[in-house]
């Protein structure tokens, strides 16, 4: 029993000390960053179960809550993908920076500054050629929900 408590304490401290990766600052879309956060949280949650329980049944009982949390997290990420207009501009961190017109003006200014400094990530779908105005949409999306823009053919082949 003492070993179990020490192991739980150890993994709790490890989970607290482990910094969650900042996927949204790596140039990823909000939906993708959300799914990666769900995956990271699931791994941190299930690791003590894998280490502590040797039998398959005990492991599944331990990991059941982690899996429920992961499913709920993915459902929340689908809501983020369904409401792309609620997302902030790629350069701004706060969602309520002003009116839509102010955001567009600020986004274009920030984009020009970042382009001059070369701060865009390679392979970022939003970097494009600079003519997209900070959006990864290339055409009217009334007919489909696909917003992905691929910059090279290697990413299209899976």
Curated annotation (Swiss-Prot):
Biased composition (Acidic residues): 141-158
Signal peptide span: 1-19
Predominant place of localization: secreted
Stretch list, region Disordered: 82-158
Top-level division of the source organism's lineage: Eukaryota
Entry annotated with the keyword Secreted: yes
Entry GO CC: extracellular region
Record localization: Secreted
UniProt tissue specificity: Prismatic layer of shell (at protein level). Expressed primarily in the mantle with highest level in the mantle edge and lower level in the mantle pallium.
UniProt KW keywords: Secreted, Signal
Biased composition (Basic and acidic residues): 84-107
Name recorded for this polypeptide: Uncharacterized shell protein 1
Species lineage: Eukaryota, Metazoa, Spiralia, Lophotrochozoa, Mollusca
């Amino acid at each position: 029993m003492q070993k179990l408590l020490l192991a739980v304490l150890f993994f709790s401290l490890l989970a607290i000390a482990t910094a969650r990766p900042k996927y949204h600052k790596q140039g990823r879309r909000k939906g993708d960053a959300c799914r990666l956060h769900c995956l990271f949280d699931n791994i941190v949650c299930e690791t003590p179960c894998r280490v502590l329980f040797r039998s398959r049944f005990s492991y599944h009982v331990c990991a059941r809550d982690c899996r429920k949390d992961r499913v709920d997290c993915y459902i929340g990420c689908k809501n983020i993908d369904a409401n792309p207009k609620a997302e902030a501009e790629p350069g701004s961190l706060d969602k309520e920076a002003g009116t839509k017109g102010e955001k567009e003006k600020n986004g274009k200014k920030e984009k020009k500054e970042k382009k001059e400094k070369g701060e865009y990530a390679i392979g970022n779908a939003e970097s494009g050629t600079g003519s997209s105005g900070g959006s990864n949409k290339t055409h009217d999306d009334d007919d489909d929900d696909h917003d992905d823009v691929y910059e090279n053919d290697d990413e299209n082949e899976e």
